Amino acid sequence: MSVLQGVGARAAAIFFACAPACPAIAADAAAGLQKAQVCVACHGPDGVSANPTVPSLAGQPAQFVATQLLMYREGKRKDAQMSPFAANLSNTDLNDLAAYFAAQKLPARAADATTDTQTGARLAREFNCVQCHGATLLGQQHIPRLAGQQREYLKTQLRGFKAQTRFDMDGQMTSAAQPLSEADIDALAAYLAGMR
């Protein structure tokens, strides 16, 4: 089954707007490994980023990876490195890369002893992150994994949603981020990054 199939009601609009004839393409993780070699420079070996501002792709849901690449390819999401890279990806490439990264494991990181995890945990409960991101915040379908993601990257994304400068397919994250203070963003990102 293609990872671009069954993306869900919230993502349907982007597919109708960006790729009206997205064919069903079987995903090939082995082919994805070959195609992912260029990704290693930023996202790290096997999609495990060592750069705190660059997301780890290991263990992300395949539909999420394919959807993000599609949004970069179609100009809905913009980034100086990702937009040119995605511009020439075929639907087969999107699926293969997505299958490869979804199959990788994100290793456990040492917890930051200076982090106030109680505030972050409270905010995650208060904002009901599990409703969309899954019970253990590992992501599902076209919604990303948050657990174990790079702290600085998470902060940047939350700030972008709050400022409405980050593309938000359905407006859920923009709404959720509005009441967050900078201290809340830091605490929430620290908590999520430290999850195993």
Residue ranges with predicted function:
Residues 10-21:
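Bacterial N-terminal signal peptides
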Residues 22-26:
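Sec/Tat signal peptide C-region and signal peptidase I cleavage site
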Residues 27-46, 112-135, 150:
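Sequence/structural segment immediately N-terminal to covalent heme-attachment motifs in c-type
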